[in-house]
Amino acid sequence: MREVISVNAVGQAGCQIGNACWELYSLEHGIRPDGYLQEGLTKPKGGEEGFSTFFNETGSGKFVPRAVYVDLEPNVIDEVRTGAYRELFHPEQLISGKEDAANNYARGHYTVGRELLDDILDRIRKISDQCDGLQGFLFTHSLGGGTGSGLGSLLLEQLSIDYGKKSKLEFAVYPAPQVSTSVVEPYNTVLTTHTTLEHADCTFMVDNEAIYEMCKKNLDISRPSFANLNNLIAQVVSSVTASLRFDGSLNVDLNEFQTNLVPYPRIHFPLVSYAPILSKSKAHHESNSVGEITNACFEPGNQMVKCDPRVGKYMATCLLYRGDVVTRDVQTAVAQVKNKKTVQLVDWCPTGFKIGICYEPPTATPNSQLSSVSRAVCMLSNTTAIADAWKRIDRKFDLMYAKRAFVHWYVGEGMEEGEFTEAREDLAALERDYIEVGADSYADEEEF
């Protein structure tokens, strides 16, 4: 067994993305909202090994997610406790406090968040005791909120201490350039990135603005809600985890992600693209061949973060196909991409394409605007272009910190001001790392 524990949900964003993900997982595996199998099924879809990665089967035949929900204020988790999927989760896996982090990293990390830490770790330990061979952890949280950034990074630190060698993958909601929910997002993002840089093995960033635009352009939703965004994010998370949950010709496990995508420990922020993203009205007019969806992944309009990969260089690329896909078509599509001059690979990593194929086609939730398609692809690519995202947030951090704006709220919660400069220097070093990695190595060789 290769189980994965989802720490779905640290904070509001994490909880709501978690809801969308578990609704989708349940549909994909044929599990009803009450945790029992759909009529006509004798066992969940995905085979014995597959579904047990994410679900634990009880003696009564109920399937319980290996997941923990965490938030410092009760509202969002109360929605889970009273919602359609309330019977799916173990009540003790829904952990909420009484006061929120007020968009303040220091409250989530040092004061309010720390009070809940023992309860959360205790619950995670109980879930891990039920696992035969724990593979790792999957986090969903936002970088800009107080709970997501503060408590999220505190949990990652603790899990590194308690479960040293286990993989820790994050899906992190990055503050969008235009769609901002709080003024202090740049502070929270820089502080949490600094704290988690050495603890997370691989971080898939998701940018709300990029997903807003996908919903508007591809799904024809004039005013996308957070539910629309979360349904789309859930499809991506499902694609990344599909090869852990279903059989395929080329399966990828958690450790393989970092082995294939992370050339240096600090440079662990792959860019995620997904195709096809089609509304129900357009679905029948598209052929969605393997070649078309593969090419679409290299278009900026299908990326989860606003940046331009055409100006960056690719260090490593992972293509995860789902559904009606044969290896020969994939090889042809990849060869065509490599022949194009638009995709630049770094010169020290010439081949750089890892491929996974899972035969289970993508599923669309009933209330989603996404259409059901026979095949889809999710591309994870480690590209130097994602450094743009760090530059943007660092610049906003500098503008505020030059005036020491809002700093007193953080210091008042027991944080030292020196942490701001330390975190900012670490991110400046991260920007430099990306520049160095993208530089051609021929110049270095001439020195010898």
UniProtKB/Swiss-Prot annotation:
Pfam families in UniProt: Tubulin, Tubulin_C
Keyword annotations of the record: Cytoplasm, Cytoskeleton, GTP-binding, Hydrolase, Magnesium, Metal-binding, Microtubule, Nucleotide-binding
Record lineage: Eukaryota, Fungi, Dikarya, Ascomycota, Saccharomycotina
SUPFAM superfamilies, per database record: Tubulin C-terminal domain-like, Tubulin nucleotide-binding domain-like
Record carries keyword Acetylation: no
Reaction catalysis annotation: GTP + H2O = GDP + phosphate + H(+)
Keyword set includes S-adenosyl-L-methionine: no
A GO molecular function held by the record: GTP binding
GO cellular component, one term: spindle
Cofactor(s), names only, from the UniProt record: Mg(2+)
Protein name (Swiss-Prot/TrEMBL): Tubulin alpha chain
